Amino acid sequence: MHAMESRVLLRTFCVILGLEAVWGLGVDPSLQIDVLSELELGESTAGVRQVPGLHNGTKAFLFQDSPRSIKAPIATAERFFQKLRNKHEFTILVTLKQIHLNSGVILSIHHLDHRYLELESSGHRNEIRLHYRSGTHRPHTEVFPYILADAKWHKLSLAFSASHLILHIDCNKIYERVVEMPSTDLPLGTTFWLGQRNNAHGYFKGIMQDVQLLVMPQGFIAQCPDLNRTCPTCNDFHGLVQKIMELQDILSKTSAKLSRAEQRMNRLDQCYCERTCTMKGTTYREFESWTDGCKNCTCLNGTIQCETLVCPAPDCPAKSAPAYVDGKCCKECKSTCQFQGRSYFEGERSTVFSASGMCVLYECKDQTMKLVENAGCPALDCPESHQIALSHSCCKVCKGYDFCSEKHTCMENSVCRNLNDRAVCSCRDGFRALREDNAYCEDIDECAEGRHYCRENTMCVNTPGSFLCICQTGYIRIDDYSCTEHDECLTNQHNCDENALCFNTVGGHNCVCKPGYTGNGTTCKAFCKDGCRNGGACIAANVCACPQGFTGPSCETDIDECSEGFVQCDSRANCINLPGWYHCECRDGYHDNGMFAPGGESCEDIDECGTGRHSCANDTICFNLDGGYDCRCPHGKNCTGDCVHDGKVKHNGQIWVLENDRCSVCSCQTGFVMCRRMVCDCENPTVDLSCCPECDPRLSSQCLHQNGETVYNSGDTWVQDCRQCRCLQGEVDCWPLACPEVECEFSVLPENECCPRCVTDPCQADTIRNDITKTCLDEMNVVRFTGSSWIKHGTECTLCQCKNGHVCCSVDPQCLQEL
């Protein structure tokens, strides 16, 4: 798409938005969730009480330091979520006054352990945290350094627009970021908490007023009407790009279908295909009917369908009678002759013997018996006693004469049999006669008529002229008519898992998982009663296979590669242990040259003098050293040894407390500023417990681990789910684990690890920031936007994606199995 076309389309889009999103002084109630009103907080609500707020227009509530459970009822929470579910533009608004050093949750929307949306303010680390889940179901945390817990009133708004995030404090834009798009596909059972994460953790202490969720673009306008609005919003732009991508995909698919249709039409133009049927060497066209013996047959959709012919009773005139005609199933009228008191059909012969014993032969012709001239008889090679006289011929035949070799009328499923003086038709075994002369026969369905010999545990299946006795499932054959129960367990012909027990049953078998395994028997997985943590896999009963970097029965213990000597970092780097792995971090005075060597070999000296990152006073000269610097007096001069810190001169020997950190003490020593944490003397009764929480002996200052079992003392720290946690006077504060920066275009977060790593292949990366200005050409030379996906032309299971100008394709194994 050309740039001019894009700008015109965006302007048009903004005009449309302007027509439908004009706001006045109020907010559409259908787009607003007034949390405090909906929760109906009052005097009977434990842990909160109504107090004066920033203004008198709405109620304000003090969240006290006492047990409480401010959780929305199920019906109320579902009303919230119905407005919020699957929306990509919404804003959190709150007016609050948080006490000093409190770390608490403002609001939390979570399902089990999955935090879909949680806003937290930490007074310990002076930062605001947003925890959320993205559309890929991965947890994310955004940290905004800001002092909110200062016992002062603040207006906070956090606006989401697709992947665009804006934080306003007191109507000032503090942060604006591009993040992974949050998921609002909230499952049933999701809970809504205010002022706490759950009953035991994340207590907010202070006052809250005007807590609202606005499901509309740029909801911060409701709190600060004078702020500027933008058009289109990020979500609008994402929607526009998505529509373009959808239209592009439809166009591509339609073009491909049209191309295939044209190819098929070209082939069809060259031939005409008609479905036909073939029977006994004769081909019949679609819907054509014909008679085959005693059946009426039709060709339907290339298949022959036949029905037994129903013969009508013929109404014959005088001197005729119904009789079978060669090649036809039903009787037809045929001329007759009357001779010596008996009726004969046309062509039928009869012998008469005279008084002298002479044989005279007559034949019915034209309704009259006429004399047939005797042409003589062939000589017989059998004795007189084996010669047989015939009723329709004056010539005798030898005993055993083959009358069937002469012309006979036996047709389908009928066989010719010789008698002493003639041939007759007889139905084959398993067939019955369709007429009295047995010339035509049909199959007997022994199964339907109960004329079979199949015994118990079998199923009767009809076949032409016979039947079969098929064994039921779970049984094996004894003979043609009998089956007995089959022990699949004994013969190892079962489908039980290797970790299951097989129990034989009548007609089948049951599979039961062995102790220590769970499942349906056909699939059994090992069960570990304490679970396998940190990505470990349960491979046998109560046996965990731990990923690299963890150990212990439940993989609960992180291996400290640094202290145990598994790693040797470069002399210019320090080994930093991380959950599951480690990092070689450049020491003070060094920085990475951009190569990010895993062992720290890429650490280079920082020229503090050249970059101005030194504390030498004006009367000294800075000399760069490997890993540091030195403040030296010019030759022949005396120096004061003063230092420069935060733009202020500190005298040599001076000691001071940092303005923004009362727990750190700095001193100036001959031009160098040395800072350290305050030394904690727990024997001193006046020790500052805020700086020395480890000196707080009170039981009320202890914390309970997230697992509900481990107890920590004030000041203790631990790592939980890629977060660094600290117990401070009874409160648990957790923040994202500090990860080394990855200055690379493509990175991947390995499974069960906390920090991303660089990769060179964009197709392996999972943290690419989609740049919609970069496009790809697919195999059909169709332009694809970054973020779009399609099925590769000519395949059914190859999915391709455009990742920042790179085409990445992979085969879906599940799709292959379904083919």
Curated annotation (Swiss-Prot):
SUPFAM superfamilies: Concanavalin A-like lectins/glucanases (SSF49899), EGF/Laminin (SSF57196), FnI-like domain (SSF57603), Growth factor receptor domain (SSF57184)
InterPro entries, alphabetized: ConA-like_dom_sf (IPR013320), EGF-like_Ca-bd_dom (IPR001881), EGF-like_dom (IPR000742), EGF-type_Asp/Asn_hydroxyl_site (IPR000152), EGF_Ca-bd_CS (IPR018097), EGF_dom (IPR024731), Growth_fac_rcpt_cys_sf (IPR009030), Laminin_G (IPR001791)
Residue intervals of the EGF-like domain: 400-442, 443-484, 485-525, 526-556, 558-604, 605-640
Disulfide bonds, paired cysteine numbers: C404-C416, C410-C425, C427-C441, C447-C460, C454-C469, C471-C483, C489-C502, C496-C511, C513-C524, C528-C538, C532-C544, C546-C555, C562-C575, C569-C584, C586-C603, C609-C622, C616-C631, C633-C639
Keywords, alphabetical: Calcium, Cytoplasm, Disulfide bond, EGF-like domain, Glycoprotein, Metal-binding, Repeat, Secreted, Signal
Span of the signal peptide: 1-24
Presence of the UniProt keyword Kinase in the record: no
Pfam annotation, one family: Laminin_G_2
Keyword Transferase among record annotations: no
PANTHER family according to UniProt: NEL HOMOLOG, PROTEIN KINASE C-BINDING PROTEIN NELL2
Physiological role: Plays multiple roles In neural tissues, regulates neuronal proliferation, survival, differentiation, polarization, as well as axon guidance and synaptic functions. Plays an important role in axon development during neuronal differentiation through the MAPK intracellular signaling pathway. Via binding to its receptor ROBO3, plays a role in axon guidance, functioning as a repulsive axon guidance cue that contributes to commissural axon guidance to the midline. Required for neuron survival through the modulation of MAPK signaling pathways too. Epididymal-secreted protein that signals through a ROS1-pathway to regulate the epididymal initial segment (IS) maturation, sperm maturation and male fertility.
Name listed for the protein in its UniProt record: Protein kinase C-binding protein NELL2
Originating organism: Rattus norvegicus
